[in-house]
A protein has these predicted regions:
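Beta-strand-rich domain onsets/edges
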Residues: 1-18, 24, 32
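Residue-level recognition of well-ordered beta-strand positions that form the cores
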Residues: 20-22, 40-42, 84, 100-102, ...
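Short beta-strands and strand-coil junctions in structured, solvent-facing domains, enriched
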Residues: 26-30, 46-48
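Short loop/turn segments at connectors of secondary-structure elements within structured domains
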Residues: 31-35, 91-93, 109
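Extended low-complexity, serine/threonine- and proline-enriched intrinsically disordered segments
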Residues: 35-55, 99-101
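Short, solvent-exposed, Trp/other aromatic-anchored flexible loops in extracytoplasmic proteins
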Residues: 54-96, 102-106
């Protein structure tokens, strides 16, 4: 999720997170998969062995098992999925975004990405 970032509010959109998620196959090639994505936002606890603090926000799951729905979020030039997640409030601290990928065969993959607030 290296391209993932906080986005500021403007006249058109609320503050949010632009999240990019890539899934790799056994040959380390980024691929499309029929999966469901779940996003959760946590406070970042500074100088802690467990930096993930209180959960701030969740979003409804993104079920991408339908090919047409999957294509809506897939950015072929990046070989990744792009999600625009609206925030309930303006970002005022650093966060950790956790994404869980749920496969149809009940496997789960989880990744976390730190998000730094911009001045």
């Amino acid at each position: 999720m290296p391209l993932t970032e906080l986005t500021a509010a403007n006249d058109v959109a609320k503050a949010g997170i632009r999240a990019y998620v890539g899934l790799m196959d056994e040959y380390d090639c980024q691929q499309k998969w029929p999966v469901t994505f779940r996003f959760e936002l946590y406070q970042q606890v500074p100088r802690s062995a467990e930096p993930k603090g209180k959960r701030i926000q969740t979003w409804p799951d993104f079920n991408l098992t339908d090919p047409a729905k999957n294509n809506q979020f897939w950015k072929d030039f990046l070989r990744a999925y792009e999600f625009n997640l609206e925030l309930d409030s303006a970002p005022d601290q650093n966060y950790i975004l956790q994404v869980t990928c749920l496969f149809p065969d009940n496997r789960r993959l989880t990744a976390e990405s730190p998000l730094k607030k911009t001045p």
